[in-house]
Amino acid sequence: PEEAIEAYNKALTLKPDYAEAYNNMGIVLQDQGKPEEAIEAYNKALTLKPDYAEAWNNIVFPLRSIKSKISLSEELTSYYPKDTGSNNYEIYRATLNYIMNLGAAQAENTLDEALKALGNSENIVIKNPDYDSRNIGSKMPLTDKVVALVHWGRSGTGLLHSLIDDHPEVSTLPSIYLSEHFNHSNWERMISDGWSQMADRFMAMYDVIFDAKSKAPVHSKSLILLYNIGLKEGMANVGDQRDEVLKVDKKLFCAELQRLMSFYDQLDALLFFKLVHRAYDKAISDIHQKSLIFYHIHNPNAHAQLNFVRLAPEANWVMMVREPVQSCESWLRKNFEKNDYTGVATRIITMLFEIDTIIYHKQKSVGVRLEDLKESPRRTVPALCNWMGIKDNESLYEMTAQGKKWWGDPSSPDHAQDGMNPFGKTSINRKIGSIFSESDQYILQTLFYPFSLRFGYVEENAEQFEIDLQVIRPMMDEMFDFEKTIAEQTQVDPEQFMKSGSYLYLRSGLIERWNILKEFGTYPNMIRPLKIN
């Protein structure tokens, strides 16, 4: 690490305006457990390159690492990047402030500020240079109903999506390809070549929709590029014999999308999104009249999620949930096996904050228990249909993708040689303990208690909860047993391990969640469970 810092300093001596070097230096400093210095490096990168999305994303980690230690007289915002004249500065800053205040008392205010900043942005619509108002009579009505599906840990979003897939009233694209469609930078790329090239640009950005074997990447959370995502999600071995590849005819899709676009004088990301679904249905010969778009937004970054909320304020949200500690252990299993401590820490914090998201509290939203879907599908599915405003249908009890039999996510620990049983109970019956010791579980179960109570995973015991909160606070200052295992596997001295950036990030987030529970006794913005008669 020290050699890396020295190398970046040399590079900056030769090229003082090298923003990427400052960004990379920030990553190293954060890993070393020097969050203040990392923040300084990211700020320098953003002074040189104000729209540097990666640096805006990276600065969240050191800010989170110091947040729990900042005194009441000090404002976290003093560490934020300063405005250097960027057109998108207010968007980036407001989004950052929203992220840093998830679950806080001022969460609603920061949400409103972020939505306002996004709404004031330039280039949020693109105009049709060849618009002919005489075409208006040919325009077909588009559905206003959109249901967005988000995950929480490993909780079965792929399963639910596959059950919804072939419903005659629902339009949905396969997999999670479009999870970052509403990210401002993605939309800017979409319209960068002008109106006439948008259909081609979409097909290039999402080539995997048209051939599940495509190796072309799609953008995911935190600017990560996902390669071979169609293969990894099992979209290239569908059908009764597992020998079919999901494909869409590009010529048919492009022609239909361009035809639909011609009826509009301008488009924003949401309207274009709806036209894409209409063109997709036409290209796969789905002739059913659709009343709803089911959007597997999955695990979007804050920017994409906020922009979707701004454009589709009436959209409904569904979160798949599962017993929290079991869900968490399953989700971070691969990170743990690779000794990827940063990934483990990030996923634990993500789950603890996502249960307290103001968006789900304000919007029409429900949480669907994986356990209910597995154990009582004939009660749970109709209840969800009623909530979504669609009819129950036999297609809802089979796993499909583009109407073809889907055999499940190959990365799932429950993906057997003969595929997955949609209502098999292996996942929900799996015992906890492969990663988390009893001590680890006790801390996490206490922090997840309000959510577990709301969703019926535990019986209410407020007095014991108060006791548990007090007991776990000093325990959180020590290493978890799973952390000791990673330190041993990676041959890192425990004292040095506790100085790492990921350790500080995890501890600061845990303490922040503990403080909220101590103050309010619950998480104020939790999603509500689906009511099942």
Describe every region a protein language model picked out.
Residues 103-141, 146-147, 390-533:
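PAPS-dependent sulfotransferases, especially Golgi type II membrane carbohydrate sulfotransferases
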Residues 176-296:
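PAPS-dependent sulfation machinery
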